Amino acid sequence: MADQQEILNTILLTRLNYFSLAGMLELYRKVGSATLILEHKNNLRDILPDASDKLVSAIQNCEEARKRAEEELEYDIRYGIEPIPMNDDRYPQRLKDCDDAPLILFYKGNANLNQQRVINIVGTRHCTPYGEDLIRRFITDLKQLSPNVLIISGLAYGVDIVAHRQALANGYETIGVLAHGLDDLYPRQHRETAARMIEQGGLLTEFLTRTNADKINFVRRNRIVAGMSDACILIESAAHGGGLITCDISQSYGRDVFAFPGRIGDHYSEGCNNLIRNNGATLITSAEDFVKDMRWQDDATLMRAKQQGIERSLFPELSSEEQLIVDVLSKTNDLQVNLISVKTNIDISRLTSLLFTLEMKGVIKTFAGGMYHLLK
């Protein structure tokens, strides 16, 4: 977990008079810490030789940004908002791997953002009774097939809010990704649902307090919805809509995209039907279709393994490196390969081979999104 100084400095970097996220991310990923960037602000080109003049100048002249960062952190502490910088273990690892991931997120909730299985459900703000019934049946059936899934959406009208409410009703944790700061809620009609989500999931944003819900922010938040997830599910959409933007971003991140077909000629089925016809999404008609396509029948596999008494003491003989991986997974539950590499200090190429061997021995299981699970 990042300390307060690192959090403050990361917020500061987001407030600089500098508009290229790519340039800042390149520097941040190379250094690994906002604090180290600021400590080396007078010799940045020793670290990143091709850093632009504007980037260097913005970092060297950061006093105004520091004041705003201090105000933000004070507010966050007072109102129970958790700032999560990119170098914090709590940061969504799937999102971290994306080229345009935000440097910091702000969170209110209790759900683990790095769960084994994460999906997003998106679509039109004008959800029809057909769409509402699809969401209800899909989530209800999914709960029986795969009970531990984190469901993400945008807390907007229509498909978003129906998905959140059905997730809550079925005992799923659900995250709402917002297009503004956590000092407000848009739309306000969803306050009651949002309050329940904080107790059974959470609210997440990249935006500081006092940030309005401007139109461009909704497009920006869609990349977080897409980046955090293993799969994107489009329920209903007109020929053009925000849900289709999330589908496009999901494809660019290499995520699986699914869509429910609708009746020909229905306005809010046109986007889904077009996406399926153009091979932009896999057609599904049920939760069972989805689980099979994602190869998520592994809940039954894990249950059988436990019933057969596959305990760690009965594992095949392990090498010292294999045992180190097992020890890390036993303490931290599910992890992606990058985090396992960090915690074991084993380079990725070697680690990949070791993980494959452990899976062949029946010691671990791999899931969508590159998550590794220790079979206990």
What are these regions (language model features)?
Residues A2-Q4, P85-K376:
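Glycine-biased, small-residue-rich flexible motifs in mid-sequence functional cores and linkers
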